[in-house]
Amino acid sequence: MSANSMSDPRSPNKVLRYKPPPSECNPALDDPTPDYMNLLGMIFSMCGLMLKLKWCAWVAVYCSFISFANSRSSEDTKQMMSSFMLSISAVVMSYLQNPQPMTPPW
């Protein structure tokens, strides 16, 4: 073991520990896309439920998927799962009330 320490050219007094930069100097860490998509998903879910618009319910599912895909693992998953379940329930309720195929909005 002492032979290893004798042949090691690194000096232990020059070792510097890594310190991550603060989040305010790196704007890439504060990406607002998941939050915006979560909010849009909830808005479209409510429009799909209240106005019985199937395309709004499908857009809500799409926004929920984008929000889930762009979120960090450290974020709260309860809000994301509630948004996802709200969008799924909007699709289910809109098709239970009117089982006809969706007509394009244009």
UniProtKB/Swiss-Prot annotation:
Q: Does the keyword Chaperone apply?
A: yes
Q: Where on the chain is N-acetylserine found, per UniProt? A: 2
Start-end of Polar residues biased regions? 1-10
Give the stretches traversing the membrane. Answer: 33-51, 53-70, 75-95
Q: A Gene Ontology MF term for this entry?
A: protein folding chaperone
Sorted alphabetically, the keyword list is: Acetylation, Chaperone, Endoplasmic reticulum, Membrane, Transmembrane, Transmembrane helix
Location in or out of the cell: Endoplasmic reticulum membrane
Q: Topology: which residues are Cytoplasmic? A: 2-32, 71-74
Q: Which family does it belong to?
A: Belongs to the Asterix family.
**What's its job?**
Component of the multi-pass translocon (MPT) complex that mediates insertion of multi-pass membrane proteins into the lipid bilayer of membranes. The MPT complex takes over after the SEC61 complex: following membrane insertion of the first few transmembrane segments of proteins by the SEC61 complex, the MPT complex occludes the lateral gate of the SEC61 complex to promote insertion of subsequent transmembrane regions.
Q: How does it assemble?
A: Component of the PAT complex, composed of WDR83OS/Asterix and CCDC47. The PAT complex is part of the multi-pass translocon (MPT) complex, composed of three subcomplexes, the GEL complex (composed of RAB5IF/OPTI and TMCO1), the BOS complex (composed of NCLN/Nicalin, NOMO1 and TMEM147) and the PAT complex (composed of WDR83OS/Asterix and CCDC47). The MPT complex associates with the SEC61 complex.
**What protein name is recorded for this chain?**
PAT complex subunit Asterix
Q: Which organism is it from?
A: Sus scrofa
Q: What is the lineage of its organism?
A: Eukaryota, Metazoa, Chordata, Craniata, Vertebrata
